[in-house]
Amino acid sequence: MILVVWQTLALAIQVGAVLLSLRDHEGIAGVVSVVGFAIAFASALWVLTRPQLTRAARNTAVICLGITPAVMWHSTNLLMFTGFDEQLHMRTLRDIISSHRLFEANPILGVSPQYPGLEALTVLLHQTGLPTMVAAWVVILLCRLALVTVLCDAVEQLTGDVRAGGIAVAAYAVSPQFVFFNSQFSYQTLALPLALAAVSLLARARTSDYPVRLFLGATVCLCGVAVTHHVTSFLTATFLILWTLVETGQSRLRVLYGALVAVASALAWAMVQWSLLQDYFGPIFDDIASQLGGGMRRKPFEDAAGSASPLWERLLLLYYALALTALVAALAVYAFSRWGRRILGPPEHRPQRWLPSLMLLSLVMLLPVLLAARVVPKGGEIFDRSSSFLFLPFSLLVGRYAVRFWWLEPRRPHAEGYRHPPLSRAVAIVLAALMFLGGYILGSGADWSRLPGPYQVSADSRSMDSEVLAAVAWSRDNLEPGSRISADRVNSTLFSAEAGLWPINEFRGRDTPSLYFGDDWGDKETETARILQLRYLYVDRRLADELPRLGSYFMVGETSGGQQLTDWELTKFDTVPGIELLYRHGPISIYDLQGLGVKELRNGWYGETPTVSLVTQLAIGLLGGLLIGLTLHSRLRPRLAAPARLWYEDAGPALTLATALAGATLFSIVLLLLHIWLTPTAFAVAAGLVVLINPGRTATLIRAGMTRVRWRQVAAGSLLAVPIAGVHGVAAASAADRDIFQVQRILDDPVAFHASPTTTGASK
């Protein structure tokens, strides 16, 4: 309970930092925010390093490590996702909800609709009656819970030590993507725990007397990964192939099964999307090759606009790099000191040449190498993306060897359970917390990106202020969905996800940045607009205030050098005949280019949302309720309950949760492919029918559940719920003021200019 109090304090500190940043105290707010994250991590690690650690305390600390940082990161805006990638996936999610079907085109991230696992799971929760944002939030928290609990369980199973699982989660928390990337609404957030669960199930199957149940769970998880994230599915298949090569005996055949399933599911789903995957990966590989060959280098501790990180952040990043390198080196030395002779010794002393531990260590040793590769622009992205996967074996080795090194092994006679005095423990926790902060800062980007504040150019969340949101809201209500629009990089995602428009950057050899860069508008620009079939043009005069924070205003390669837009370039549209002003407030204008002879083309989903009749909803609910209720009432129930009980005994709660997430994802995708749309009415009818068919069993389950409730803990939790709810209420009120009330004031401002566009027929 004390740990939860500290976690609540950390969340309150983060919300306080958000409020400070909004009041132009960004420097102090950044320090306060980091202190909050340090408290969240250190308090959990303090519990994990207790001399006497119970499983309940370990589980509480592990859950806090997974949930609290994610909530703290999103506390900057609880009402909307402000990440660039998150808005891309929100477009895919809203297309599914609007069209009731899969695979509607995404204008910015074409591969997203082809891997709809995350969105399908969110849709299934939304169909129960949850609002869209609440359903998305539930998915994120479930994924975070599955990630840390599956990792903890896997390490405990491999090491046989309760503490090792918790230490492994703490070690994984220092990865750069743990706080930011793997807690956002993006497909890797779901795919990563599913992949880890599949690997863990296969690890258990190696020594199981009846591995079929575990194979089934691994198959469900691997298929869930295959339909959720292309990169994770490919990397999982590659890892399982390598694992098969280094395994021996009967275990090799069991791991081989997982490798075959991973390869088959990944390739089967990817073959359909091959052209999109080429478009996705091709530019990345070309960009990396040009940077490595052309000598491009990034300036350390600076963003693309030249803004430098504070000194204390630089010191934390340097400490992180040194600590990570030293820790990897220590792992290598310690590992080789324990089992190196079996690898390098005489043949009679090494029955197997390649050990799985050596494979894991080899993967871990890539971390310092890729960290050094951050000197090139794409090197940072490669390290950040790969760290989510490479830190998994890192955490396993740290959990295994930290327990052996720090705590005496129980096999040794007359040994105390704890080797070091409390001062050493405190110093170790401080050093680990500093490393956690270094990873958090490295993965979350520049200091300005971690907290809200005044508008900045091409700065992701800092480019989504009330002025921008008001323009997007007006466009959603007044512009035809699917219409083509040009906008800067960040706001293109908002127009796509929130307004249903179709942002476009280039088409048939022409691009939209050329319309902005240049002092005049001539025949060439008019021809470009016609070729692009560009109906609307979005302009924010603040783009001329500075260079883009993340390297480009619109897209990579928009100009030959770091050219800054000027105010004249962004105001020239007012004097061009044929360009009509539709919206203006403050620095933002939206123009209609139809007067230039642009033939309108609408893309993506822009139809009416299909209606599901009440009869259909009742029929689906009745069929589902009868199927489940009669099954539970029949002789099939014990036949199904026995395998389920055995599965739970074999897999445990963490892997059961991950497998359930994968199964729900696949179930939702199948329903969408069959054009079956569930509704809250269908769920309510089905649940009511199950209760009516099985009243006695329902009452028994309720009584059994009530007897298992620990009412003292419920009372204590209720007391803590009040301050937790208060902190979230403050954060939500702050977000509502920016996202709702200020937006409405802008839309109602009498000095704003609003005009209705001319409606014309459009082709698709």
Protein language model features and the residues they cover:
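Membrane-embedded, hydrophobic transmembrane alpha-helices
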Residues: 1-56, 596-711, 717, 732-735
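Extracytoplasmic
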Residues: 4-7, 188, 400, 404-623, ...
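Hydrophobic/aromatic-rich transmembrane helices and adjacent perimembrane loops
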Residues: 30-35, 181, 188, 234, ...
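Active-site lumenal/periplasmic loops and adjacent helix-entry segments of GT-C-fold
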Residues: 51, 56-61, 68-193, 389, ...
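Membrane-interface helix-loop-helix junctions at transmembrane boundaries of multi-pass membrane enzymes
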Residues: 51, 208-212, 250-257, 329-365, ...
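Transmembrane alpha-helix segments characteristic
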Residues: 59-67, 218, 239, 260-261, ...
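Membrane-embedded helix bundles of polyisoprenyl
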Residues: 63-70, 118, 122, 140-244, ...
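Transmembrane catalytic cores of multi-pass membrane glycosyltransferases
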Residues: 85, 186-191, 213-216, 220-340, ...
